[in-house]
Structures are given as structure tokens and as C-alpha cells.
Amino acid sequence: VPPGGLTXAQXFTIQHIXMT
């Protein structure tokens, strides 16, 4: 998924998964 296509909600979820 392109970073430019991430929404606030998606980015927030992706950041949490990554951090886990």
C-alpha cells in the first residue's frame, strides 16, 4: 500500500502493528 494512499485511520493501525 502506497504511503500517499494511507488514511489517518490506516496509518494509525499500520503504526500499531509495526510497533507490536
Swiss-Prot record:
GO terms for cellular component: lysosome. The active site is at residue 16. Its EC number is 4.6.1.18. The keyword Nuclease applies. It catalyses: an [RNA] containing cytidine + H2O = an [RNA]-3'-cytidine-3'-phosphate + a 5'-hydroxy-ribonucleotide-3'-[RNA]; an [RNA] containing uridine + H2O = an [RNA]-3'-uridine-3'-phosphate + a 5'-hydroxy-ribonucleotide-3'-[RNA]. The keyword Transport does not apply. Transmembrane segments: none annotated. GO terms for molecular function: lyase activity; ribonuclease A activity. It is found in: Lysosome; Cytoplasmic granule. It is an enzyme of class 4 (lyase). Keywords: Endonuclease, Hydrolase, Lyase, Lysosome, Nuclease. This is a non-secretory ribonuclease. It is a pyrimidine specific nuclease with a slight preference for U. Cytotoxin and helminthotoxin. Possesses a wide variety of biological activities. Belongs to the pancreatic ribonuclease family. Interacts with and forms a tight 1:1 complex with RNH1. Dimerization of two such complexes may occur. This is Non-secretory ribonuclease. It comes from Sus scrofa.
